[in-house]
Amino acid sequence: MKNIRNFSIIAHIDHGKSTLSDRFIQVCNGLSEREMKEQVLDSMDIERERGITIKAQSVTLDYTARDGQTYQLNFIDTPGHVDFSYEVSRSLAACEGALLVVDAAQGVEAQTVANCYTAIEQNLEVIPILNKIDLPFAEPDRVAQEIEEIIGIDATGATTCSAKIGIGVEDVLETIVAKVPAPEGDVNAKLQALIIDSWFDNYLGVVSLVRVKNGTIKKGEKFKVMSTGVAYQVDRLGVFTPKMKDLDHLKAGEVGFIVAGIKDIHGAPVGDTLTHAHNPTDKPVPGFKKVQPQVYAGMFTISSDDYPDFREALEKLSLNDASLFFEPEVSQALGFGFRCGFLGMLHMEIIQERLEREYNLDLITSAPTVVYKAIKKDGEIIEVDNLSKLPEPGAIAEIQEPIVRANILVPKDYVGSVITICIEKRGVQVDLNYVGNQVSITYDLPMIEVVSDFFDTLKSVTKGYGSLDYELIRYEPANMVCLDVLINGDKVDALASIVHKDQAKYKGRELVERLKELIPRQMFEVAIQAAIGGTIVARSTVKALRKNVLAKCYGGDVSRKKKLLEKQKEGKKRMKNIGSVEIPQEAFLSVLKK
């Protein structure tokens, strides 16, 4: 066990984490030259296209160090984006050390700081690594100082490397061997194994990636999942090199995969503990918490024939993604669909893109909302993740909205504009620190403001240099109202949203104007209104098309013309009463994108 090293890499998007892991695999001959490709561990197409890591992966490599000994390096790849922070905390729970990889040209980013604190809280050895030192404008000394000032770990003598051209990769491996502590655990104790990740394979069923904390698990043995108590038999186990390599057993300290013919992903929940069925341990590995979705949205198929395929696609996706929540929902405007819960906006975009790309579905997504708490006058508290659950306005004593603590890191030139957008988004400043060239700004912001378009606005005002990390801290009473959209007097449920009362008129006017441009002209007038309760706050009218009914009268008597015009007027009146307005797809999308 003393020659095992379990570590993961903490890095911001684009700081070179996946490239560095490629180099590790090359140096340790994990794959032949022919099998190597860029970003080996990012297995989903969407991961490679967007250049981000979404799912945690693992690789076991044998490295012969300069001291002549061979070490087993278990490297668990982690995502860098704030939406996937639970994936990160799980991966860290399986390690003894973490490499903090920072781009020597860009410096420290907010999400890196957040993940780094998670690692420090879990008592991991954090080792700073400065990557991309081959870039002409790399400033390793300035960045090392930033790491010390912002994160508070000693970065003097931090290992420098360039993963892209392969300089210093062996130095990094030597640093891992020297500084990451060997795992603790007892091979002869009762089995305790943490499930780091599970995914569904069409041939094998559920494949679980586990870190054995204590004991040994062998092929053919029976084990049980602690939270469900269900027992399974091990069909296959082994390690990824990154290819699957079968072994007879996994012992304390090792990281590998287990296949036991489990058909349902919820049979092996991520973060759960496995133990022997006949001689179980009493206590699970700490750190298992159920993931709560933060953002909810309705998803609907454009053609109702696709509904069964959509359900199947969601079930398959949720096999791989334990944090995706869904339940059936019916909307008057959009038909049958599902109410889905996500970790954040990026998570939502990725799920939608995977559904459209991997399962060929055409989807509409309704406006994302967060979970509000409605406190009724009789004291009952209702969690509102869907407007249909909101009680009547008369029955509500107060509505509470979720508040997040946002930590923003920006270069000091942009502080003014960042503070301006935070104030516009109803933020309250908590802290502001100057650290070298960077400024760390902490604000308490309503979550709905953060999930709608805060990240995009932040990126545009800071020219892409701002970075953001946030976590839910509390609920606060807020003056929220439900903004309905009426078209010809009929409510369109898919366009309704919860907004702050101060912004309701402005949001209503903006929404109505946008819909006016998108709803095609009909043979009759179409009234578009935004309303709060019974009060109309904005209105716009799509003018009617008019057929020239007098074209066939050459000259002739005026009363004849009047008769024709009156007849047209009557017809339009009747049409308006019975005619329904088709709202085009773009209208929904444009409202939701805003």
From Swiss-Prot:
Q: Where in the cell is it found?
A: Cell inner membrane
Its Gene Ontology cellular component terms are: plasma membrane
Q: Does the keyword Magnesium apply?
A: no
Pfam families assigned to the protein according to its UniProt record, in alphabetical order: EFG_C, GTP_EFTU, GTP_EFTU_D2, LepA_C
Q: Which Gene3D superfamilies match?
A: 3.30.70.240, Elongation factor 4, C-terminal domain, Elongation Factor G (Translational Gtpase), domain 3, P-loop containing nucleotide triphosphate hydrolases, Translation factors
Could you tell me the Gene Ontology terms of the biological process aspect for this record? positive regulation of translation
Q: What does this protein do?
A: Required for accurate and efficient protein synthesis under certain stress conditions. May act as a fidelity factor of the translation reaction, by catalyzing a one-codon backward translocation of tRNAs on improperly translocated ribosomes. Back-translocation proceeds from a post-translocation (POST) complex to a pre-translocation (PRE) complex, thus giving elongation factor G a second chance to translocate the tRNAs correctly. Binds to ribosomes in a GTP-dependent manner.
- What name goes with this protein? Elongation factor 4
Say which species the protein is native to: Francisella tularensis subsp. holarctica (strain LVS)
Q: Gene encoding this chain? A: lepA
